A protein has these predicted regions:
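Nucleotidyltransferase catalytic core that binds NTPs
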Residues: 1-222, 228-235
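Acidic/histidine-enriched ion/cofactor-binding microenvironments in catalytic or ligand-binding pockets
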Residues: 239
Length: 239
């Protein structure tokens, strides 16, 4: 990085590996808009509030590197835990207000503090011009934008549209943990989203009830939340 001059623009995509077309679309966007494209691969332990989730997270580093090579990603940063965390270091505490009080923030305590901790560390190391994140994790995207403001940084955050399977299922590294039958059943989530998009006039209470009813009648779904939120605050909208 020390060889990169200030005249060069740096595009950065932080990932936890197990790369799929969603990740690769971020790299492609960076290649198009920036002089230098950097991707990091690091499974961040502080954003997992479930030890089994961390232990089972897919590790496909060789395949990941091959995919990045095919896209001509300029630099791949693959730090070890000790490169980023002191021994015994915990996640940093942040105050993102209402951005973290609903949805993933409610059901995965500590997740966003861990995510923001590692993103801040990576931003300080890479010092990108633009950082690319997927819109699939919309709550995370809004928190990263808030993080940059708290850092008083000039890093630009770009959200890239969700990449989906032909079935409509959003591309996700954790899809690899699903059986083929479970993947087919998960399409119901996309169908519910489309229904809401096409029936906005029915009103928020009706749409939330519709999603809840559709998902809860399937025994393989355990619904944690179904929310319609204000983009800038992530606060649920009830009417």
């Amino acid at each position: 990085l020390s060889k990169i001059t200030k005249e060069k623009t740096i595009g950065f995509t932080p990932t936890m590996g197990a790369l799929h077309q969603g990740h690769l679309s971020l790299i492609e966007e960076s290649k198009e808009k920036c002089d230098i494209t950097i991707c990091s691969i690091f499974v961040n332990p502080t954003q997992f509030n479930n030890a089994n989730d961390l232990a089972n997270y897919p590790n496909t580093i060789n395949a990941d590197l091959e995919k990045l090579k095919r896209l001509a990603c300029d630099i791949v940063y693959t730090p070890a835990i000790e490169d980023l965390y002191e021994k015994g270091e915990k996640e940093k505490e942040f105050d993102f207000g209402s951005l973290t009080t609903s949805m993933e923030g409610k059901f995965r305590p500590g997740h966003f503090s861990g995510m923001a901790t590692i993103v801040e560390k990576l931003f300080n190391i890479i010092q990108p011009t633009i950082a690319f994140f997927g819109q699939k994790d919309l709550q995370q995207l809004q928190i990263v934008k808030a993080l940059v403001k708290q850092m008083k940084s000039v890093i630009k955050i770009e959200g890239i549209p969700t990449i989906r399977e032909e079935s409509g299922l959003a591309k996700s590294s954790r899809n690899e943990l699903l059986s083929e039958n479970a993947k087919k059943e998960a399409i119901l989530i996309y169908n519910c989203l489309n229904y809401c998009k096409n029936n906005k006039k029915k009103g928020i209470p009706y749409l939330k009830h519709y999603i809840t009813r559709q998902l809860e009648q399937h025994e393989n779904f355990k619904l944690e939340y179904a929310e319609i939120v204000a983009l800038n605050t992530m606060r649920p909208i009830e009417t």
